[in-house]
UniProtKB/Swiss-Prot annotation:
The gene is glnA. The keyword Cytoplasm applies. It catalyses: L-glutamate + NH4(+) + ATP = L-glutamine + ADP + phosphate + H(+). SUPFAM superfamilies: Glutamine synthetase, N-terminal domain, Glutamine synthetase/guanido kinase. Residues 15-103 form the GS beta-grasp domain. This is Glutamine synthetase. Its EC number is 6.3.1.2. Mg(2+) 2 binds at E135, E188, E195. GO terms for biological process: glutamine biosynthetic process. Keywords: ATP-binding, Cytoplasm, Ligase, Magnesium, Metal-binding, Nucleotide-binding. Belongs to the glutamine synthetase family. One of its GO terms (cellular component) is cytoplasm. Probably involved in nitrogen metabolism via ammonium assimilation. Catalyzes the ATP-dependent biosynthesis of glutamine from glutamate and ammonia.
Length: 442
């Protein structure tokens, strides 16, 4: 028995653990889990070693019924109790990796997709870090049953206008109990909208954290009688929810993006990484903004990125370079939203950026104007293109991008495209209230 497993068993015994949740995500990033009754604490050693068989054909995006057997193996580094369920101290959780019965990694496991990309560049000495900024809405219902924001607060408001203060405090405390390093929490721009940021970390740990973060929020809000949504654009005329992703590369403990001897203090690698993100932005959008609703957020006028450009401290461009330098030097990609699968999104972002470094893709000069104030003809003269304006455009861009397809791998790419084609066709044929209001009197 390893020391790590020994410490886990001791902690489980201390907490009186009676059930172990084995958790993973489907192709959408939606958490799934199995609960195992624990007869004795050292039983977990066998579970970690041998895993547990499950039916993968019942999970969207995994396997067909004729090859349904898959194996869940807990990652010991993800052990935690669930602080938002204090009445059930006897429950712990592991995030799992998925394997075929012969011991080979299952290529349709989103967590494996990210681990594969990270391992590829770890061999070259690179460590990829991500710091996400997920936004979300807390919702209520009016007397007619309509979904409404739970408050009328705006950016950085305080109580009583901001009615989410106590909720955010509770959530931050629970996240810290899960070893999150929370940096800040606040009310966002739209009524009922909030943001909690946690410090950047290694990409795999961060992706695990995003899944846990969303799960914790939904559990806590449900207990106080409200709803929470990570839907990108739940209300017309209001800002949508994004998940801006701050990214950096480290090598031998040093930030690869930092060069104190250049005018901007950005290294060549940083600029090439930006160049890769810009080049592959249309295909990246399919993975990082993966729903039909995502594209109702990505429109001018609501602080969401639309134009494929980068700037220093410029929040109107797709990519922003925050002012921090040294170990804090980073690139902020502003198009992702919290409906994305973080494992797939981080893998795709890493491959896009590294493709830029490997091929020395020059991003050009930074854009320091407010691009929202320019016409399309002016932007085209400047060489600035737009992101896809619909899921249909985005998945067609993905079809043409071998780098992002390669990041996903053949299995995930094919399943992802099947699902997105169905999603678009289902959306395309529906008749909405707007159409009845606009065209019924024809």
């Amino acid at each position: 028995m390893s020391d790590k497993i020994g410490r886990i068993i001791a902690k489980m015994d201390e907490c009186g653990v009676k059930f172990v949740r084995l958790q993973f995500v489907d192709i959408h990033g939606k958490p799934k889990n199995m609960a195992i009754p624990l007869v004795r604490p050292d039983q977990i050693e066998d579970i970690i070693k041998d895993g547990l068989l499950f039916d993968g054909s019942s999970v969207e995006g995994f396997v067909d019924i004729n090859e349904s057997d898959l194996v869940l193996k807990p990652d010991p580094d993800t052990f935690s109790t669930l602080p938002w369920r204090p009445e059930e101290k006897g429950v712990c959780r592991f995030i799992c990796d998925i394997y075929w019965p012969d011991g080979k990694p299952f290529e349709g496991d989103p967590r494996y997709v990210l681990k594969r990309a990270l391992d590829k560049y770890a061999h070259l000495g690179y460590e990829y870090n991500v710091g996400p900024e997920p936004e979300f809405f807390i919702l209520d219902q009016d007397e007619d049953g309509n979904i409404i924001p739970h408050d009328c607060g705006a950016y950085f408001d305080v109580e009583p206008v901001d009615q989410g203060t106590d909720f955010r405090r509770k959530l931050v405390m629970d996240l810290e109990a899960l070893n999150f390093d929370v940096e800040v929490s606040h009310h966002e721009v739209a009524p009922g909208q909030h943001e909690i940021d946690f410090k950047f970390d290694k990409a795999l740990k961060t992706a695990d954290a995003v899944i846990t973060f969303k799960q914790a929020i939904k559990a806590i809000v449900d207990k106080i009688g409200y709803m929470v949504t990570f839907m990108p654009k739940p209300f017309f005329g209001e800002n949508g929810s994004g998940m801006h992703c701050h990214q950096s590369l480290f090598k031998d403990g040093e930030n690869v993006f930092y060069d104190p001897d250049t005018e901007t203090q950005l290294s060549e690698e940083a600029l090439y990484f930006i160049g890769g993100l810009l080049k592959h932005a249309p295909a990246l959008t399919a993975v990082c903004a993966p729903t039909v609703n995502s594209y109702k957020r990505l429109v001018p006028g609501y602080e969401a990125p639309v134009y494929i450009a980068y700037g220093l401290k410029n929040r109107s461009t797709l990519i922003r370079i925050p002012a921090s330098r040294g170990k804090g030097t980073r690139v902020e990609l502003r198009m992702p939203d919290p409906s994305c699968n973080p494992y797939l999104a981080f893998a795709a972002m890493l491959e896009a950026g590294m493709n830029g470094i490997q091929n020395k893709i020059d991003p050009g000069e930074p854009t320091e104007i407010d691009v929202y104030e320019k016409s399309m003809s002016e932007l085209r003269e400047m060489g600035i293109e737009t992101l896809p304006s619909s899921l249909w455009e985005a998945y067609h861009a993905l079809e043409e991008d071998d780098v992002i397809k390669g990041a996903l791998g053949g299995h995930v790419y094919e399943k992802f495209m099947e699902i997105k084609h169905r999603e678009w066709d289902d959306y395309r044929v529906r008749v909405f209230k707007y159409e009845l209001e606009r065209y019924l009197d024809i």
